[in-house]
Amino acid sequence: MTSFVEANEIVTIICYHALEKRKKMKLERLKKNNLARNMVIVLLVVGIISAIILTFTKAKYKTAESIPLVNGTINYELSDLNLIGVYIEDGSSYTKTDQIPDSGYTLNAEKSYCKIGEEKQDTTITYDMNTKTLNIAPMTTKGTKCYLYFDEQKTLLADAIKRDKTVKTRSLPLTTSSKVEDSTTGTIYKAQDDWGDTYYFAGNPTDNWVRFAGFYWRIIRINGDGSIRMIYNGTSTATTGTTTMINNGASQAFNSSYDRSEYVGYMYTSGQQHGNTTDSPIKDVVDSWYSSNLANYSDKISKEAGFCGDRNMASGSSWSSTPSSTIYYAARERLYTNKTPTLKCSNSADLYTVSGSSKGNKALTNPVGLITADEVAMAGGVYGQTNQSYYLYNNQYYWTMSPFNFNATSGFAYVFYVYSNGYLHYDSVNNAWGVRPVINLAHDVVIKSGNGSSSTPYEI
């Protein structure tokens, strides 16, 4: 039989367990309530963040605008661009238009600007004519107005010459069978000079005409430094006659002195093979003509390119001022014997340049000279072979600046010249023939108009 004390202990234990059970149930309910509350809080936070992101996204993209172009549209982002004024170059001024030009113009970034009210802003403006993409940065202030100025796209003469041309190379030697005398319009030939790749005309092209400083010129080649070499053709596009030479074809001796080897030099020094202290009479004539007719255009004439009067000797010849036997210069060996002309100048003392050039003898006062016999040969004037169908033919006699020989028997110095029927020949320096100056236009010269034909020459 259970005692009172034992019964009391049993009741106490039962009550304790019941109490513990109620505590556990209450704790579990509390945990469930806390979990539900936390889930609600998380959902609220996620909702708020999503709303913020959505708001900023809408704010960002609702400012996208478009500018109408000639073809298509370009998109850009901005805060509030009220106006874009578009101006295109029209001669010496600008004309306002209602659309960005489709081609033929480039953005003048220095002249273009944006402003807020009356205050100009420090912005960077770029425009890609190919992709039709306009960029304005920064663009963050409402009421911004931008003004875009477009300049007519300039075409470099060198680019215009090479545009749509077929580039060819020619194999040496240049024999009679390789003489170029046919129409070569649309063709230009590649070789090497002292500056790199050079592109020259040969045969009878009709697309190598330039009008510069009031005169017509024929392009000889694009030099390796990018300048453009040209020979004088006169005040008209007539290709024959005395008007294709300066001073209306007045004849000029290369040098009035003739009885020493050094007199073959465009410049010379008594007793020296490569001296350059004295001007030849023909150089005096060329310089005088330049000073009277081209000096005011000197900013468009190259100070880098030069003119080669090669005084190196041919194989088997040794230089002497008054040799006892005939001596020959290297150009005679190249053009008469081997038919292998070159546009490189093997001795820097014979490359006539002005002081501003990086190459040559820097002896010239004016950046003007004469054509070389090698250039005549590469154009089509093969030694001793008549050619009246190439662009250097003018039915006249005129000098080159390339030495030929010193004849010990006659006691005369000889220089190459172009014969009246178009081929290369030689004559004593004291004889008088025509003069056709050669200049090099600067590599960055642009054209106003023209396609290189005689009726529409490249206008500088």
Regions found by a protein language model. Name each.
Residues T2-N34:
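N-terminal Lys/Arg-rich, disordered targeting/topogenic segments
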Residues E6-N8, C15, A36, S348, ...:
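Intrinsically disordered, low-complexity peptide-like regions
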Residues K31, L35-V86, N451:
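Short, polar/proline-rich extracytoplasmic segments that appear immediately after membrane translocation
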Residues I41-V42, I52, D80-I460:
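Long, domain-scale functional regions
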